[in-house]
């Protein structure tokens, strides 16, 4: 093989290897940051993956907030007005967190009716609701 042609082939193969590695790293990073959204009904139905990072949204059920006597542990229930799941969280809750409030929790499903949250997000004002929660709740009201 001609030395010039061989050098061009080597450079091309090297560039393709570098680009492939970069693409693989980008896809791996994106895969680690993707959090799919589920409703309490989907979790109860077993549609949500167990032990995978997901988001769940709904309304905090009335009289369901139970705080530990010591520490920052909190347990509460969220509902989509069809099904309810228990959420456990250890940390400081947002100031806007309260019963009847729309929230999105990030964490893992431990079983069909329990969710362990690592982050809890509350809506910012009276008119805001995450689009996924709004559409899921609208579907439940229409039925």
Swiss-Prot record:
GO terms for molecular function: heme binding; metal ion binding. One of its GO terms (biological process) is cytochrome complex assembly. Pfam families: CcmE. Keywords: Cell inner membrane, Cell membrane, Cytochrome c-type biogenesis, Heme, Iron, Membrane, Metal-binding, Signal-anchor, Transmembrane, Transmembrane helix. Residues 1-8 are cytoplasmic. It is a single-pass type II membrane protein. It comes from the Bacteria. The chain crosses the membrane at residues 9-29. InterPro entries: CcmE (IPR004329), CcmE-like_sf (IPR036127), NA-bd_OB-fold (IPR012340). Residues 30-143 are periplasmic. Heme binds at residues 124, 128. It is found in: Cell inner membrane. Its main location: membrane. GO terms for cellular component: plasma membrane. Coiled coil: none annotated. Heme chaperone required for the biogenesis of c-type cytochromes. Transiently binds heme delivered by CcmC and transfers the heme to apo-cytochromes in a process facilitated by CcmF and CcmH. HAMAP family: CcmE. NCBIfam families: PRK13254.1-1 (NF009727), PRK13254.1-3 (NF009729), PRK13254.1-5 (NF009731). Belongs to the CcmE/CycJ family. This is Cytochrome c-type biogenesis protein CcmE. The gene is ccmE.
